[in-house]
A protein has these predicted regions:
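A short SAM/SAH-binding and catalytic strip from SAM-dependent methyltransferases
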Residues: 137-152
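Short, glycine-/aromatic-enriched active-site segment of Class I SAM-dependent methyltransferases
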Residues: 176-196
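Class I SAM-dependent methyltransferase SAM/SAH-binding core
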Residues: 59-128
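Conserved alpha-helix/loop element of class I SAM-dependent methyltransferases that forms part
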Residues: 24-62, 76, 80
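C-terminal lobe and adjacent flexible extensions of AdoMet/dcAdoMet transferase-like proteins
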Residues: 212, 218-224, 229-322
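A short acidic, Gly/Pro-enriched loop at the edge of an enzyme's catalytic core
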Residues: 127-139
Length: 322
């Protein structure tokens, strides 16, 4: 597993000397009342999307964040919890943990509401989390799991599943790629550490989550990320990489398979006021209803000429039914 050592070295260097845009992409910073993000945290934002969403953070959840970076998303999570050890940050790189501790001191100076004790930083491995079973409401990782190869990815997801409470949420952002990558790219340890050559197709990424037992999956965003071109990388063709934001919910697995929301909607436009499929789905006339892919398929299979099923937008924002 030498690629994991390479990854440690890359992020050890990034902790000692912040590298803007090292592996990821510049993301808009949440503008929240009374929240000021120190510049150093922004420079050390090694994520490829956002894992912080207010709808996940009601009722004072206990949050776990794996791969702390410069601490920016930990600070954002703490904004919602504002309690001692309300957010637990785990990282395998000592230098990154130390950098985050220093950054939290700066955050205290800029935010009167924030105390460093709101975040409990721990040395630990994503493959063996120092966290008790069923103790976390919201777990998060940003641009980390794409680095793992198949065996380690399974272990990392299983660990997140283990520590989450029933109905807890794993929120993630990772690069994905729908094209085949050659073995030279796949086996380049530095490119993998830089979140470039470990990207999976969305279907495989989602399957890794459902295989772990997550009964509900929400794909919340999908956007451009990187290009690997033949002039700069060992590839004969242009490779387009996207990033996605996903929530995997520790719901019981339905008998007919997981509920995967990819942004599809059903619209009934018939003569009646509504359509009821007698399976828990009521479509009010001319009102779009968000549905999971499984339900979308079942409605399409009815062959009706008064129900429209949209394509996946990959921007599911809640509501609807499965």
């Amino acid at each position: 597993m030498s690629y994991l050592e390479t990854t440690k070295n890359v992020y050890r260097d990034a902790a000692l000397t912040p590298d803007v845009g090292l592996c990821c992409t510049t993301n808009p910073i949440w503008e929240l009342p009374g929240l000021k993000i120190p510049k150093i945290m922004q420079e050390m934002n090694y994520g490829c999307g956002s894992t912080v969403n207010a709808r996940d953070l009601t009722n004072n959840p206990r949050v776990l964040y794996v791969g702390v970076g410069g601490g920016m998303e930990l600070l954002q999570f703490a904004y919602f919890s504002r309690q001692k050890s309300g957010v637990v940050g785990v990282d395998v790189v000592d230098e990154m943990l130390e950098a985050s501790r220093k950054n939290f001191i700066e955050a205290e100076a800029q935010n009167s509401w924030f105390k460093s004790e709101f975040v409990d930083l721990k040395k630990g491995d994503a493959l063996n989390l120092p966290v008790e079973d069923n103790s976390i409401d919201v777990a998060a990782q940003n641009c980390l799991f794409n680095i793992f190869k198949t065996e380690e990815l399974k272990k990392a997801i299983d660990e997140m599943y283990r520590v989450l409470k029933p109905h807890g949420r794993l929120v993630m952002s990772d690069p994905t790629c729908e094209q085949e990558m050659n073995e030279t790219l796949r086996n380049d340890e530095r490119l993998r550490a830089l979140c470039l050559s470990g990207s999976l197709p969305i279907k495989d990424y989602v399957k890794a989550l459902t295989d772990a037992g997550f009964g509900t999956i929400e794909i919340r965003a999908r956007k451009p990320y990187r290009i690997l071109d033949p002039k700069h990388y060992p590839t004969d063709e242009l490779i387009y990489i996207e990033s996605i934001e996903v929530a995997a919910i520790k719901d019981p697995m339905p008998e007919d398979g997981p509920c995967i929301f990819t942004g599809k909607a059903a619209i009934y436009y018939g003569e009646a006021d509504h359509f009821d499929d007698k399976k828990g789905h009521v479509l009010v006339k001319n009102q779009p209803l968000a549905v999971c892919d499984k339900t979308a398929g079942a409605l399409a299979a009815l062959g009706r000429d008064d129900i429209f099923i949209s394509e996946s937008t990959f921007h599911y924002d809640g509501g609807g039914c499965c």
